[in-house]
């Protein structure tokens, strides 16, 4: 007989100097991206310089809206942090500001997810001092 173990919480992100502003904002319920001060391009994952022109970047609040670019449904996972969530959706979301973010879609049955659907950010606390962005269907687009 196999022994059932309690699910573990989702892993908390590890912040470094480049990502600390991002993770601090998510814990406050805000989504941030970097914007180039020279060309205005937005980017995420954080970097020291603009990917387009190598200019300086600054952190700006993102609106939290986006569109599903692609997704997959996870139906098997052996990690105690995720096994209890099965089935769950991992998606690439194109933020309205431009960057593409890998995330989980929540609040929707996996069979109802569609490429091109509008979603919005919400935040899940995963530890005392960390939250992660997840996305859910945007009711304004229904």
Model region roles, listed by residue range:
Residues 42-43, 57:
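Cys/His-rich microdomains that often coordinate metals
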Residues 35-38, 49-52:
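Short, cysteine/histidine-rich loop/knuckle motifs that typically chelate Zn2+
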Residues 85-101:
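Short, basic/aromatic beta-hairpin or loop at an interaction surface
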Residues 66-68, 105:
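Conserved hydrophobic positions within beta-strands
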Residues 71-77, 124-128:
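Short, conserved beta-turn/loop elements at beta-strand boundaries and strand-helix junctions
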Residues 1-31, 141-142:
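A broadly conserved sequence feature marking short terminus-proximal activation segments
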Residues 4, 98, 103-142:
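Well-ordered alpha/beta subsegment
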Residues 30-33, 47:
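Residues immediately within or flanking Cys/His clusters that coordinate Zn2+
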